[in-house]
Curated annotation (Swiss-Prot):
This is Glutamate 5-kinase. Its EC number is 2.7.2.11. Keywords: Amino-acid biosynthesis, ATP-binding, Cytoplasm, Kinase, Nucleotide-binding, Proline biosynthesis, Transferase. It comes from Listeria monocytogenes serotype 4b (strain CLIP80459). GO terms for cellular component: cytosol. It is found in: Cytoplasm. One of its GO terms (molecular function) is glutamate 5-kinase activity.
Length: 276
């Protein structure tokens, strides 16, 4: 199945706050620049690319010199407003160095749930892609209250990236995180932790292996990534979870190399291949 990834034409790349930011709250410019180069080169190769990027609140905290993520809704939305503007400025700068035009698309759950507005989003994304533009999608944190409280089914950008992948009928969703893939135990505490190379069904046993929430500036944990993977598999789409510290790993994935965990449903008897 990995070999078939070479033929993927339309890609959705999701990058999380933990990949865009250092643990000390500063922006990881090196990673962002590499990401811009990789995605621009995929465009040069003839691929269609959509970037789903978190980071508005994390970048906003950095811009406003906040060491702790705010907890009140008005403060979170204010920080997101500043951060989203700064984030797009950074992306535009780095993508511009490679001659790649980007466009901002901010979504909320009601927009993707309502048929007419959902179709408008699909048409807009298709129009951007047809013009060779890389859409940069984020949830509109400035108005999306429920996501900021972590109580909605929309969840965070992990699930949003899966929804976007379905909307544009992407061939592959690549989720860049701060972990190499899905493990049977926490690799940070268990040196013998085993990574799944492929998962064909999200079972209760798989869910039980997932831990809690993610970084202090982000919202996602392994459970949200499993929810996104489940959404993709229900839509007969593929998702790969891998480490985003070096975005050039995307090139290796597109060559069919065994990197990260591939989530893909199979009709035959389920099996979980592992890498040791």
């Amino acid at each position: 199945m990995r070999e078939s990834l070479k033929n993927s034409k339309r890609l959705v790349i999701k990058v999380g706050t933990s990949t865009l930011m250092y643990g000390n709250g500063h922006i990881n410019l090196r990673t962002i620049e590499k990401l811009a180069m990789v995605l621009s080169d995929l465009r040069n190769e003839g691929k269609e690319v959509i970037l789903v990027s978190s980071g508005a609140i994390g970048v906003g905290c950095h811009k406003l010199q906040l060491s702790v993520r705010p907890t009140s809704i008005p403060d979170l939305q204010a920080v997101a407003s500043v951060g989203q503007s700064e984030l797009m400025h950074i992306y535009s700068k780095f993508f511009g160095e490679y001659g790649q035009v980007v466009g901002q698309v901010l979504l909320t759950r009601d927009v993707t749930d309502f048929p007419i507005s959902r179709e408008n989003v699909m048409n807009t994304l298709d129009s951007l892609l047809s013009r060779g533009i890389i859409p940069i999608v984020n949830e509109n944190d400035t108005v999306a209250v429920e996501e900021l409280e972590h109580v909605t089914k929309y969840g965070d950008n992990d699930l949003l990236s899966a929804i976007v992948a379905k909307l544009v009928q992407a061939d592959l969703l690549i989720m860049l995180s701060d972990i190499d893939g899905f493990y049977g135990s926490n690799p940070a505490t268990d040196p013998e932790a085993v990574m799944f190379s492929e998962i064909n069904q999200i079972t209760p046993e798989i869910e039980a292996l997932a831990g809690g929430r993610g970084s202090k500036f982000g919202t996602g944990g392994m459970l949200t990534k499993l929810s996104a993977a489940s959404y993709c598999m229900d839509s007969n789409q593929k998702m790969i979870l891998t480490n985003g510290k070096n975005p050039t790993v995307i090139f290796n994935i597109m060559q069919g190399e065994q990197i990260g965990t591939l989530f893909a449903s199979k009709k035959e008897e389920l099996s979980h291949d592992r890498t040791h």
